[in-house]
């Protein structure tokens, strides 16, 4: 049986700006199918004896460890890998190279995608090398992260890339592959650097959009801020007639310092696609915060208000990848809110609210308030405040984002819970 092994050296940069060797990731390739195992570095374990675990499949002990159940790769490394947009860019680039070199395109495996992400903009604080004395991967010192002034060019590149069905436009790939490969999701996007050295995610219009998605995400983002929820800095810019570009500041960076981020999918031991259909529930997030949160009271209140807010705007894409945690010196904290969008025909969330029901229903949210250590009286008051804030401001914010009256009427059903 044909087999070969790839050894990847894993580092973390969340305890200091100096990278610390975390351990070794072993990737076994048997007839084009990869399997993974990981072993912590002994010195890292000694220095981290009382540290929080980074993945439920990677407990803090010596020796090889393997993903559990049907998982092929540890969630810790899945969070560092690109999602659909980044994978599409890498796959298209391989096709171009194969065409130029007169060969068949190589099938890219999970480890290729993992190592293909540009290190400078990689999400979180986990980093990778193939040689301990070599660079962190992927490395490209000749072309730094694009500056803010390149946004218009990047939006044009993303549009040309989407419209290029043959996949042979080399120049668009070159402009997008590095700033876009580090990010999750399916939408065209890129990471850019502002004049103060802060990283931002730019989400561009897509040819598949039926509405101005960027403008509506900005509306929802600002509504969340008005409701007192934790959201990063954001802005909206129009570069073309095709739609708005929504920009949000990366919360996994503090200047040059990296902050470790883990999705709820990883920390709850879930696989991609986990949803209400398999019983995945907000109550699991509640349990994780109670057991592992550094500020459980604050985070439980924030999480519960997010449930009500998601209902108020009919955000039906609130799956486990769209919830996350950041690791600080004192432990795990609920990450800022991200990727919230209104859906006019939405009537169920992606996750169950209680154990088995995902219906957009204020009664359901109130039912689980005690699990979040919120009294019935306080929950009713908080819910009323969220709904009133959405009801009183969604039209105004939509107009400020340049959305027409007809666009607002089309999206009105998304806010029906608040408008009742």
Question: Where is each model-derived feature located?
Answer:
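Phosphate/dinucleotide-binding and metal-coordinating scaffold of catalytic cores
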Residues: 1-320, 324-420
């Amino acid at each position: 049986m044909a087999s070969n092994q790839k050894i990847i050296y894993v580092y973390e940069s969340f305890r200091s700006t100096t990278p610390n060797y975390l351990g070794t990731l072993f990737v076994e390739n048997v007839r084009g199918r990869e399997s993974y195992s990981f072993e912590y570095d002994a010195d890292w374990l000694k220095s981290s004896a009382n540290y929080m675990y980074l993945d439920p499949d990677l407990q803090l002990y010596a020796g090889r460890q393997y993903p559990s159940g049907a998982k092929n790769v540890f969630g810790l490394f899945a969070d560092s890998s690109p999602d659909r947009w980044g994978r599409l860019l890498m796959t298209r680039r391989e096709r171009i190279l194969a065409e130029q070199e007169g060969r068949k395109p190589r099938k890219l495996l999970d480890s290729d995608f993992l190592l293909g992400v540009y290190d400078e903009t990689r999400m979180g604080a986990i980093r990778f090398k193939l040689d301990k004395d070599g660079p962190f991967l992927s490395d490209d010192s000749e072309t730094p992260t694009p500056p803010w002034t390149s946004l218009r060019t990047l939006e044009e590149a993303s549009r040309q890339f989407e419209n290029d069905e043959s996949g042979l436009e080399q120049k668009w790939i070159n402009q997008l592959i590095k700033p876009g490969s580090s990010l999750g999701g399916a939408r065209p996007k890129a990471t850019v650097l502002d004049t103060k050295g802060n990283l931002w995610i730019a989400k561009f219009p897509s040819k598949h959009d039926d509405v101005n998605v960027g403008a509506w995400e900005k509306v929802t983002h600002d509504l969340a801020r008005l409701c007192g929820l934790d959201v990063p800095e954001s802005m909206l810019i129009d570069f073309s007639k095709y739609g708005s570009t929504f920009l949000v500041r990366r919360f996994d960076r503090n200047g040059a310092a990296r902050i470790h981020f883990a999705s709820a999918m990883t920390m709850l031991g879930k696989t991609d696609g986990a949803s209400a259909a398999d019983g995945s529930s907000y109550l699991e997030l509640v349990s994780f915060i109670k057991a592992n949160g550094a500020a459980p009271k604050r985070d439980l209140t924030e999480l519960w208000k997010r449930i009500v807010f998601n209902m108020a705007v009919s955000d039906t894409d609130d799956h486990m990848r769209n919830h996350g945690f950041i690791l600080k010196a004192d432990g795990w904290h609920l990450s800022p809110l991200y990727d919230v969008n209104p859906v006019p025909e939405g009537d169920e969330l992606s996750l169950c609210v209680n154990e088995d029901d995902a219906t957009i229903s204020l009664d359901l949210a109130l039912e689980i308030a005690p699990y979040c250590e919120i009294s019935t009286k306080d929950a009713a008051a908080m819910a009323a405040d969220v709904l009133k804030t959405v009801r009183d401001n969604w039209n105004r914010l939509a107009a400020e984002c340049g959305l027409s009256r007809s666009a607002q009427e089309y999206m009105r059903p998304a806010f029906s819970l608040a408008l009742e």
